[in-house]
């Protein structure tokens, strides 16, 4: 389950009186007058009326009516002239001296005010995420967050292999030289060249223009490509037009082939120009393209005119070839391709998926018609129904196996290994060509037993080379990843036999192991320690036996880039580990160059650097986000406080506390707890982000706290796997313990604590409210929540919960079903899209039924018609966060505050303002009294 990308409007900030010793701009003469009046009133309550009266009289125009009650005794009676008495000279001299001192002090203060620049609503200093206070600037607004105002600019480099054996080539789109251009990264002049030292034999390669214009003509029609993939020899380009989105990653489109030298265009499917193709991939030799159409797999051979070979023939609604079905796309492959060419182009491996026994789930569309088909006459009023093969826990999974196509012989075959998992208990997560062999990873359906299988297609044999019982190791599960990398033998480089590098469990943490020979079940450990690698390896330099990876070695909430030798020696950072940082990285085809993306905690930037793999020194900043830095100076961003919280239950969790820009420890603040909490997820990081949480802290003036409870990632396996078979239960305990800790702090209002989340975070919100039963949290907001894990997909759920048949008590304990306990909170909000193909609307409806049965009424619901898990149809995403309309603005003073309950922003403000308590027990107005008053 991946959180949707969502990854906010101006709201009135609560006014607070603050006295700053550093800025005269924070105190006006008027405020001092009011303070003085208030002091006198506090001393003598009887004077309050006259003080107010004097202030009022000072604002009246001449000729305003004054009644006798507005005159004081010292003024004399109306109509009686005032009797003036001469002032003592000594007293007058003292007053003059005091006045002169006051004027001098005022002028001095004015000079300091002007010279210090305190009148400017910005800071001249660089954004400091560790600052303990903020300057006088603008608040973060919801419009800024939704409009991309705070989005860091970044360049996505598409590294591309050099057919001539070089390195550092990238594919640029929309350059001055042409629409598709292959450039040498060293020749890119769009950045600041900070360091560049290279020899004559390492000079940048000349650019190659693959496509001049951003469109092409075919049969007299202008077509604009929406996707492209150059052939490995860079002589042709696959172009896709008319994309139609399917699921999270997949789409179908019409494909064309561009011949670079002649600019000739031809359709991928010669006899069906407008064919809708689901996937197309180049062969390594650039002489063929495999593609899937109507769930069957084909090969288009380019060395023969109009030569299309259909490899499979039984593809259709229940059989998929070369592409994943819904659950494999979402939970296993995390992509749209299930086709793998051998390095020599002689074999094509592809996944066959049999969904015959998988139950269907129907999704109704009330507004739109995703199929694009017009309803039959007379049936226009009926919703369109889309049926998805969606396996739920305990139901039939799709049956998958890998098939192979021998290009020279033209035959298709399967290869089974002795003792591999049976059809009903098999998940295939990895397919990797290792020379002329294939490495497969299979696990059982609950994901706690892994088998690595080595397949030899030429001999048509397979054997299991490694079996890992993860349930026996730590009681947890196998984490799916797609970074396993083949290491070919090269005696000249000290590699006597083939092998591979992969992430393995080592002493309670995830580290990198090197398996050689390739059938050796015991790896050479390249990393170790009380820290973890992430999606490792990032790249492998075969020329220098170097493995590059990203890890949490410095801190669990930071990411730095490192290299290590294949023998486990010489672990070296590529990034500056003496300074806090969260880096992402991508490498060129031969690992000689890297795109470093610094993502925080300071303003993000990107630079291309040379690596230890090449003998030159190169560094160029390609994005410094100077504009974002300037915005940060001019705005009051939240104060960020990171740390480790020791909970009473003995558990340590990372936390992030976002404080209002002018945090006052003497005030009492409400807290919004924001979280996701899913297995191996991480929300507390050192990334720079200005988002909805930032808006809440900056503009609404609330505290926003996030913790990563047990079950989340990068604190070791034991911290993570302890939640197995009982999702949500321990996490709820941790959130409640954290909230109780905060409730005890002097600057927190314990009566105003709320929690919110989306997807898994929505589930965790409701589960926490249920377990807490109103003891700690008063409010909660859940978006697209799971409420019973029996309703989610099988592959994700069973990995953490096992089968319902084997863990019925665990499923019951995890489900949100105690409506009475849930109703003990002051109020909660549920939001869901009716066409959610991921977390079905069924989840929220089941919970609503529990609430009806228990007669619980202190909640609100907002359903978004035809929205999926991201809730975006017809502008719904903005509505999730803020639903204030012109109608509600104009008439909210007449109507109930229920009018603006739907958006998270408005709902939260109503909650912390106590509005929901006012309507908790509504009473009818006495009509007799109303008539009497009128």
Curated annotation (Swiss-Prot):
Keyword Nucleotidyltransferase: no
Residue positions with a glycan: 354, 576, 818
A single MF term (Gene Ontology): aminopeptidase activity
InterPro entries, sorted: AB_hydrolase_fold (IPR029058), Peptidase_S9_cat (IPR001375), Peptidase_S9B_N (IPR002469), Serine_Prot_S9B/DPPIV (IPR050278)
Pfam families on file: DPPIV_N, Peptidase_S9
E.C. code: 3.4.14.5
Primary enzyme class: hydrolase
Membrane topology (Vacuolar): 115-934
Main subcellular location of this protein, as a coarse class: membrane
Amino acid composition bias (Basic and acidic residues), ranges on this chain: 36-62
Record's catalysed reaction(s): Release of an N-terminal dipeptide, Xaa-Yaa-|-Zaa-, from a polypeptide, preferentially when Yaa is Pro, provided Zaa is neither Pro nor hydroxyproline
A cellular component annotation (GO) from this entry: fungal-type vacuole membrane
Membrane topology category: Single-pass type II membrane protein
Superkingdom, taxonomy of origin: Eukaryota
Localization, UniProt: Vacuole membrane
Topology, Cytoplasmic side: 1-93
Function recorded in the entry: Type IV dipeptidyl-peptidase which removes N-terminal dipeptides sequentially from polypeptides having unsubstituted N-termini provided that the penultimate residue is proline.
Family membership noted in the UniProt record: Belongs to the peptidase S9B family.
Protein name: Probable dipeptidyl-aminopeptidase B
Upper taxonomic lineage: Eukaryota, Fungi, Dikarya, Ascomycota, Pezizomycotina
